[in-house]
């Protein structure tokens, strides 16, 4: 048995935490807050969601006042949320290797890893091999692009990639 850990250390969820820390963190660190790094970064993920929901609610009110149905207003508000757009832009910059974004990512992920290590040590957990998504995602992205070209997947307006599995009874 080879004990492995697969760390999902990149993606929009990571950028949400990074953006919230950048906007609302005032330079807070695990040391200044007295919190484990993984808990601190998790707090910023929650902070992003709180601000995002408030933004969507405000935009929905604007759109329903313009005569849109609640469903239409919600979809438009979620699609046009400046906060979510910033998070997506940050992800694009991360993928392009932007030094500022990558520096913030490395700093915050190191906080998370230190918090994880503390927990693993307390629990007596160890791993033979650790895999980081940030080191493997390009291969997966290549496969997704091939799937799009071959028609196995489709892309939604928001840029997300989906597979239609209704024929398999999964929708």
Regions from the PLM with identified roles:
Residues 1-171:
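NTP-dependent nucleotidyl-transfer catalytic core
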């Amino acid at each position: 048995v080879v004990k492995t850990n697969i760390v999902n250390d990149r993606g929009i969820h990571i950028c949400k935490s990074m953006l919230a820390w950048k906007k609302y963190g005032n330079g807070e660190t695990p040391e200044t807050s007295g919190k484990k790094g993984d808990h601190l970064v998790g707090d910023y993920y929650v902070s992003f969601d709180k601000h995002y929901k408030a933004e969507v609610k405000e935009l929905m009110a604007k759109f329903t006042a313009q005569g849109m149905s609640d469903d239409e207003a919600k979809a438009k508000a979620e699609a046009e949320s400046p906060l979510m757009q910033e998070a997506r832009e940050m992800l694009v910059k991360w993928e392009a290797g932007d030094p500022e974004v990558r520096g913030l990512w490395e700093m915050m992920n190191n906080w998370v890893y230190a918090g994880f290590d503390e927990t693993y040590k307390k629990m007596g957990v160890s791993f033979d091999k650790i895999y980081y998504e940030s080191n493997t995602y390009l291969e997966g992205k290549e496969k997704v692009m091939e799937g799009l070209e071959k028609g196995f997947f489709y892309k939604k307006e928001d840029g997300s990639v989906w597979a239609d599995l209704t024929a398999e009874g999964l929708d």
